[in-house]
């Protein structure tokens, strides 16, 4: 049976691991170290570690794999293939070149578009109507290896980064399992990435999280769903942070300055730069838990003045 080392960390990686383990001999799982989580800073294992332990697969958690003692241990396993999915570290050539069939990665974009750590976020932020998964060879350069297979999936207005992570995770696992038989048999010719079409999906900055109400409504709508459920887009209300977790978009145009409020007892609408409307459905005022808009409008939202504007 084909011996595989699997490397991954977040929930996205779990379906890939479980599918692999159902058919192949996964001899080791490499993931990030346990990290403190939440206000109480409880030391918490990555989702992949939990899944690996349930499957009785040995787990390695080096802080920096490149300089760790675990690196030589992994090479000594003499695996046939290395598979990664959102592991979180660039791997040294000594490991990439050690397996018989090399090292491949499950990446959540249609490469060469969106190399990097936040491809799902950027597909939504940019208003894409489709994205997908690419399986490619791993090289030391970030997400630059030749492409082995690729599969597309639509993005709807109802999707956000959370829903697309779930869909792409399952799609990636399916594509990998469909690809491996021919790949291991040497029947697939990998395709180089077109360097002229390369774009990058770098980690989201704090500045990207802040809503600029002078921008068009569709752009703001894409920002809100692209940053939901993490790290979450925010604005200010009476100079205090105000997060918008979920919202809908209305193309109906209204007069009013960007950030102006149109409200009744149960709904809140915000005017954008082109006059179209953002309609928040799940929000989080400063110092409060997140809540649906009806709860907000029946409480603190009742006191909103018609002259109040978001972003001031």
Curated annotation (Swiss-Prot):
Q: What is its EC number?
A: 2.1.2.9
Alphabetical list of SUPFAM superfamilies matching this protein? FMT C-terminal domain-like, Formyltransferase
Classification via Pfam families: Formyl_trans_C, Formyl_trans_N
Keywords, ordered alphabetically: Protein biosynthesis, Transferase
Read off the InterPro entries from this record: Fmt, Formyl_trans_C, Formyl_transf_N, Formyl_transf_N_sf, Formyl_transferase-like_C_sf, GART_AS, Met-tRNA-FMT_C, Met-tRNA-FMT_N
Give the superkingdom in one word: Bacteria
A GO molecular function term, named singly, is: methionyl-tRNA formyltransferase activity
Spell out the Gene3D superfamilies in the cross-references.
3.40.50.12230
The residues that the entry says bind (6S)-5,6,7,8-tetrahydrofolate are: 109-112
Any single Gene Ontology cellular-component annotation: cytosol
Q: Which reaction does it catalyse?
A: L-methionyl-tRNA(fMet) + (6R)-10-formyltetrahydrofolate = N-formyl-L-methionyl-tRNA(fMet) + (6S)-5,6,7,8-tetrahydrofolate + H(+)
Is the keyword Transferase in the record?
yes
The enzyme's main class, written as a single word, is transferase
NCBIfam families xref list: fmt
The family line of this record is: Belongs to the Fmt family.
What role is this protein assigned?
A: Attaches a formyl group to the free amino group of methionyl-tRNA(fMet). The formyl group appears to play a dual role in the initiator identity of N-formylmethionyl-tRNA by promoting its recognition by IF2 and preventing the misappropriation of this tRNA by the elongation apparatus.
- Its recorded name reads Methionyl-tRNA formyltransferase
Q: Which organism is it from?
A: Listeria monocytogenes serotype 4a (strain HCC23)
């Amino acid at each position: 049976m084909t011996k595989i080392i699997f490397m991954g960390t977040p929930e996205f990686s779990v379906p890939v691991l479980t599918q692999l383990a159902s058919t192949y001999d996964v001899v080791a799982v490499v993931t990030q170290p346990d990290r403190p989580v939440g206000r109480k800073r409880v030391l918490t294992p990555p989702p992949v570690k939990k899944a690996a332990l349930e499957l009785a697969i040995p787990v390695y958690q080096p802080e920096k794999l490149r300089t760790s003692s675990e690196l030589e241990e992994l090479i000594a396993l003499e695996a046939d293939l290395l598979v990664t999915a959102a592991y979180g570290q660039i791997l040294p050539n000594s490991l990439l070149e050690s397996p018989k069939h090399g090292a491949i990665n499950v990446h959540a974009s249609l490469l060469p578009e969106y190399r990097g750590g936040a491809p799902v976020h950027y597909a939504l932020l940019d208003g894409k109507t489709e994205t997908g998964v690419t399986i490619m060879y791993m090289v030391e350069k970030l997400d630059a290896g030749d492409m082995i297979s690729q599969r597309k999936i639509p993005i709807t207005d109802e999707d956000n980064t959370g829903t697309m992570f779930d869909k792409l995770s399952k799609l990636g696992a399916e594509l990998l399992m469909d690809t491996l038989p021919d790949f291991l048999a040497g029947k697939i010719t990998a395709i180089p990435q077109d360097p002229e079409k390369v774009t990058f999906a770098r980690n989201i900055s704090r500045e990207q999280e802040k809503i600029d109400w002078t921008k068009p409504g569709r752009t703001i709508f894409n920002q809100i769903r692209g940053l939901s459920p993490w790290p979450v887009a925010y604005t200010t209300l009476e100079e205090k942070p105000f997060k918008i977790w979920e919202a809908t978009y209305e193309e109906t145009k209204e007069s009013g300055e960007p950030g102006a409020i149109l409200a009744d007892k149960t709904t809140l609408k915000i005017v954008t730069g082109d006059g179209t409307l953002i309609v928040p459905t799940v929000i989080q005022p400063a110092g409060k838990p997140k809540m649906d808009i009806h709860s907000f409008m029946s409480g603190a939202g009742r006191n909103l003045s018609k002259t109040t504007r978001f972003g001031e």
